[in-house]
A protein has these predicted regions:
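Gly/Trp-centered helix-boundary motif
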Residues: 1-144, 148
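Cytoplasmic-entry segments and transmembrane alpha-helices of multi-pass inner-membrane transporters
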Residues: 127-130, 134-138, 145-179
Length: 179
């Protein structure tokens, strides 16, 4: 840690990475098409955590409430309030109210614009960052466990086992070069 701290760029990169990673762990609270919390008839509801039918908020259907629907939102606001996340889109929510055809340029509603299907780019970046980093961490952990186990077997048994494992690893490491 002291070596990283001595390098200013490395130190700031570490803090920026950790901040982005921690924020991405709470992606549902930052970018979601469901409210974080809402009050209806003096009852608190947490749509990010639980599913509620539309009938719970004065709607007609037993299906999960579509909170971005103007009718449902109006029903809730008549008898309560809603707290939305900063980005009102999830990674797969399509913005049907775009002023121009998708992909749309940045706007107040979509900070980095939308992709070719009308999905918010910021929301997709947040969720994608989390998936990519967690995948990398899990892959590193699994490969470390396999490597330590293989090295332990080679060291304990030695001889032909060690030779076979080494040849297998040499062939395995050469495979990416073939493609």
């Amino acid at each position: 840690l002291q070596n990283v701290r001595a390098n200013r760029r490395g130190w700031w990169s570490l803090w920026i990475f950790l901040t982005l990673f921690v924020l991405s762990l709470f992606a549902e609270l930052i970018a979601n098409d469901k409210p974080i919390v809402l009050s209806y008839d003096n009852e608190l509801h947490f749509p990010v955590l639980f599913s509620y039918p539309e009938t719970k908020f004065g709607g007609d259907f037993e299906t999960e409430a579509e909170y971005r629907d103007p009718f449902v939102e109006e029903q809730i606001l008549e008898k309560g309030w809603i707290i939305w996340p900063p980005v009102r889109y999830s990674y797969d929510t399509i913005n049907l109210d775009l002023p121009v055809p998708a992909p749309a340029p940045p706007s107040t509603e979509n900070m980095l614009g939308t992709d070719d299907q009308g999905r918010d780019v910021v929301a997709r970046l947040i969720y994608g960052f989390r998936i990519s980093i967690l995948f990398g961490l899990v892959l590193t952990l699994v490969s470390s466990v396999i490597g330590v186990a293989a090295g332990g077997i080679q060291g304990y048994l030695g001889g032909r086992t060690d030779l076979l494992f080494q040849r297998f690893m040499e062939i395995w490491s050469g495979l990416p070069i073939l493609y």
